[in-house]
Amino acid sequence: MSRVTLSRYLIEQTRSNNTPADLRFLIEVVARACKEISHHVSKGALGGVLGSMGTENVQGEVQKKLDVISNDILLEANEWGGHLAGMASEEMDNAYQIPGKYPKGAYLLVFDPLDGSSNIDVNVSVGTIFSVLRCPNQYLSQNESLNEEAFLQPGTEQVAAGYAIYGPQTMLILTLGNGVKGFTLDRELGSFVLTHENIRVPETTAEFAINMSNQRHWEAPVQRYVGELLAGETGPLKKNYNMRWIASMVADVHRILTRGGLFMYPRDAREPSKPGKLRLMYEANPMSFIIEQAGGASTNGYDRILDIKPESLHQRVSVILGSKEEVERVTAYHKE
């Protein structure tokens, strides 16, 4: 039986599920950009791409060289194809306007070009996260300037989301709203090949991922829940749990998709004015869409993440996602 490449899968989706051709082309362009980013990541010190730029992004985070390289690759790959009305990135203060010399399309692309980049210098898996939205009609005119407001749509409006993980293998995880597929990069063929046809998150789990060094700063519901996990068989949950923490959202979520678990990056008392650390638009929303499509759940502790109406492009949010039973338990603790 012949292998199914990403291109073939997308063409079949166009035929069977009426996936628009423009969306198919857009996903293929993003995938090609991810292949180029994978090449730079794999070169590491040999390519002179490790270390910091000496600058900060809009989040106040020090930019790694590969942050900037990856951001530029995604912009240059996607600006000219005629599929997009604009882009937004973790690494840019404002929305990116499609240059006037190129046609505008019907979609918006939002991305974290290199999630987990603080781990680059120690050779830990990192990745690219992306989300696709429809552009509101009022911004579709070639002469209409795009602003931040066009992007401020709840996660339920996403038409596609995915991530590439650059690890021992480079994989692309994708949802078009009808389940989750996994593609592995065949470097000899030069294509992403379908290797995981129906990714599902088990409803129950015995693993969780959280940064325990922040425990003293957590709110009471998270303190209670994690305390019960650590109590194991002798606690109220009557089960032993293992903790895993990579400090790369892509890597931690990928593990959960592969074998189940719970990922938590809750709000804490260090910065009371901020509702969390992770960004809603280009981290929490696409990952929540993927997790839900795989049968899991995602919450900020009180509300479904995909229902949150963004107020700003770089809005932060508390994130708890993964196996449905555990997400529901944490949510119940927050609401007591």
From Swiss-Prot:
Pfam families: FBPase, FBPase_C. Binds 2 magnesium ions per subunit. One of its GO terms (biological process) is fructose 1,6-bisphosphate metabolic process. Mg(2+) 1 binds at residues 90, 112, 114. Mg(2+) 2 binds at residues 112, 115, 283. It comes from the Bacteria. It is found in: Cytoplasm. It is an enzyme of class 3 (hydrolase). One of its GO terms (cellular component) is cytosol. It catalyses: beta-D-fructose 1,6-bisphosphate + H2O = beta-D-fructose 6-phosphate + phosphate. One of its GO terms (molecular function) is magnesium ion binding. CDD domains: FBPase. Its EC number is 3.1.3.11. Keywords: Carbohydrate metabolism, Cytoplasm, Hydrolase, Magnesium, Metal-binding. Pathway: Carbohydrate biosynthesis; gluconeogenesis. Its cofactor is Mg(2+). Gene3D superfamilies: 3.40.190.80, Fructose-1,6-Bisphosphatase, subunit A, domain 1 (3.30.540.10). Substrate binds at residues 115-118, 211, 277. Homotetramer. PANTHER family: FRUCTOSE-1,6-BISPHOSPHATASE-RELATED, SEDOHEPTULOSE-1,7-BISPHOSPHATASE, CHLOROPLASTIC. Belongs to the FBPase class 1 family. This is Fructose-1,6-bisphosphatase class 1.
